[in-house]
UniProtKB/Swiss-Prot annotation:
The gene is PHKB. It comes from Oryctolagus cuniculus. This is Phosphorylase b kinase regulatory subunit beta. Cys-1090 is farnesylated, but the C-terminal tripeptide is not removed and the cysteine carboxyl is not methylated. Belongs to the phosphorylase b kinase regulatory chain family. InterPro entries: 6-hairpin_glycosidase_sf, GH15-like, KPBA/B_C, PHK_A/B_su.
Amino acid sequence: MAGATGLMAEVSWKVLERRARTKRSGSVYEPLKSINLPRPDNETLWDKLDYYYKIVKSTLLLYQSPTTGLFPTKTCGGDQTAKIHDSLYCAAGAWALALAYRRIDDDKGRTHELEHSAIKCMRGILYCYMRQADKVQQFKQDPRPTTCLHSLFNVHTGDELLSYEEYGHLQINAVSLYLLYLVEMISSGLQIIYNTDEVSFIQNLVFCVERVYRVPDFGVWERGSKYNNGSTELHSSSVGLAKAALEAINGFNLFGNQGCSWSVIFVDLDAHNRNRQTLCSLLPRESRSHNTDAALLPCISYPAFALDDDVLYNQTLDKVIRKLKGKYGFKRFLRDGYRTSLEDPKRRYYKPAEIKLFDGIECEFPIFFLYMMIDGVFRGNPKQVKEYQDLLTPVLHQTTEGYPVVPKYYYVPADFVEYEKRNPGSQKRFPSNCGRDGKLFLWGQALYIIAKLLADELISPKDIDPVQRYVPLQNQRNVSMRYSNQGPLENDLVVHVALVAESQRLQVFLNTYGIQTQTPQQVEPIQIWPQQELVKAYFHLGINEKLGLSGRPDRPIGCLGTSKIYRILGKTVVCYPIIFDLSDFYMSQDVLLLIDDIKNALQFIKQYWKMHGRPLFLVLIREDNIRGSRFNPMLDMLAALKNGMIGGVKVHVDRLQTLISGAVVEQLDFLRISDTEELPEFKSFEELEPPKHSKVKRQSSTSNAPELEQQPEVSVTEWRNKPTHEILQKLNDCSCLASQTILLGILLKREGPNFITQEGTVSDHIERLYRRAGSKKLWLAVRYGAAFTQKFSSSIAPHITTFLVHGKQVTLGAFGHEEEVISNPLSPRVIKNIIYYKCNTHDEREAVIQQELVIHIGWIISNNPELFSGMLKIRIGWIIHAMEYELQIRSGDKPAKDLYQLSPSEVKQLLLDILQPQQNGRCWLNKRQIDGSLNRTPTGFYDRVWQILERTPNGIIVAGKHLPQQPTLSDMTMYEMNFSLLVEDMLGNIDQPKYRQIVVELLMVVSIVLERNPELEFQDKVDLDKLVKEAFHEFQKDESRLKEIEKQDDMTSFYNTPPLGKRGTCSYLTKVVMNLLLEGEVKPSNEDSCLVS
């Protein structure tokens, strides 16, 4: 009987295979038979190259458009579509063979033909792009999916195809790949860029790519998120390619050996560093929804070699191989429905939970075997090359002429799907050699040529990678690049520091304490500029009126950019960092914060400086910095600089003229001025001219005003409803700056900014009080003034991007009120609107204190990311609540300090205190309150919630928020970032921090109970609130019995109970969880030792 069943199965399989083959009738190629037979040992170099030339001619160049030079995506008749990405690899394939032909003296014109096929394609793409120069200009200012360059063009005319609504054109990886191959090909001697219009256009492409770290796109697979619902994501593969392109093109001359100073491309060093940080924080993930992805292979290996860290490279590669490798190729990503038998070809997007259908039957792509072969060649690993060559051979096919063909993918036919799902890997797959995909997959064909040329040693890695994107570890020290793609070597970087005093009298005063400084006049002819003037200079970079392109967008220059020396219009210029700018936002008035910022900036430079030559850090000392009690901390910092070590960073202080010789010099030659053009005006930092016979006085002010001077005489609630004339009278009578500001704020809301008081308009009056309060360090009045005039720090948007770069979400809004979740970078204007809209209805001062915290957290998360471990969502309002709670704990029986009266540096220290791992001395109530406010979770928490959900058919509910089992488990995977965010969203409805922490503990208890009792599962919806209530009820019973006290509804004693121990919270939580589980059915298990029969 078994034999008959096996025979029937075999016959059935043959029938199904024949049916699948019938569907593929009309194929021009069949499985490979003779193409890989060993060729004669005495084959000449000409014979070897001639063989590959014929392959390239018949499987690549045959399809190249004679007009634009682009390559079609599908080679079946009549298809007019060309994808930038595919065409680039086709050009690279022709170029690779041209490099091999350079080794033959008499090549019969083939080198020229192949090189110019590549050039024609590269210029064809440039032609398509330049016709969309208006989109480059829009995207540069406002990067959105509806302002980007197109990724699809007509193969023969170069016209754009499909609107933004019909196709996801935002694929930054394609633009980055173009820039990368442009540099590689020009470095090999090809001439691709012809004139200054093209140079300025490429420079503008660089401006677009620089900010990839903050632009979610549709990725290599053109689908955005894994759910294929039209949403974009930040992809590691896109960021990695952008990083590689920026490293390759920085300081590169687009005219090659014939170039001059104005054909050089400039890259913002700080933007490049942001991309690097983003890539390292995203990996080994591809994005929030893609836990891993085969698109990472060309990112971490050929052609980008984007990773600095060998450990991260191995971790990422291992994950890709482990999760995606198959017999026929690599899956693109898990649950990828592309071209599977169950995908509906008529629908562009998937329905919710539809991706579960594709689990286990994803198509496998042989092209990734080729990437692994190339990676093996570059890394000198012949074993890897052979392994993937052996895997590739059985899946190759051949044309009727006998040339090898790489199928685009292998799929499971519809008749085999159920068998494959039941037994993964058991069914035969069939290649995509007909139908919608055309006859040849040109991207695969091109990569096959590159891989085989490298494997057969007809070209070397140095030939195809002339800019040395890949540098072996042992050779890293010998590579002279603008900044290498390789990570920092273990060196002891010394930062050069120049001390500049703003006036001569300040210099004399500091000299009496042994601090040697220079004034702006003493460093002449070197000019000192604020970074904003450098931004003005860079605005002239890439301007092209004919194409309608402006220069570099108005983006600040960061610490790395200001650590270089610039040659501008014959002048030598140094810039002081942005932290020394006199900002309109009040934080710049706190000297202790400035000292902290200087230490952070030096640590940042030490960690991320990658250029040859030492960084030059200019410390600008102002007279206001040393007044009163601010003098001692400032003097301590200057003494530490003089001694050569500050904050763990080695520094060398010297005269600016001496330090220039060891610095990096950037020539800004794009500022070419003709006789007819007017010279741009730049304002250098000018020396302060003090009044005659004046001296610097240390005693002129104090660091913080006395508490009594800070305390207002009036309250908003008391005076809000009083008539205007009474408010004006009180305004004239009181001398307290905080009280005056509060009264003016009431008038501002009621009468408007132009209402006249005795000292002018309300808005002008508030502005003057704001300045006076700042000089006196009356922080309460300062914050009121800043809030009423809606001050906004220019560094908020970059700091929020820093949160996102580190894989965190951020919420803005007051504790206990509606919050706005930010999961993608936003413009400063949008963030300002959110802050003032969400916070002003609660307390005017909240809007400015939230800005302070965003700035503080941005610095802390950059330098000490471990303080935010376990915190996926940073809720600013809740953190403020935690800080106020901490002040209450510290005050004991006395009235707590007002958070708004603390200086910004004291606020930062308080923030650092609550972020530190909780000290043992704290009671459990305080621990839970702080951890709950910080939204901190234990290690592996979200994975445990996933495991709970797997055994909870009706889902989990807490605070009225339901997390259903389906479609959650169908749409997502266990280690997916989006699932973790979904859990956070569920917990976000809880309004009490300590209660939230008890719920987190409860979920950990549920997970452990289920783990130890595999036969149990929940039959009904798990109501966490109900379980906590029952656990508290059990706790009350024990408390009243043991302590002989009446039951109390107040849960304080429960919150203050340790989790572990005989009567710990976990024992009560475990009891109610077990009760709920035992109410349901017990699933029998064969391994259960308790079974009696």
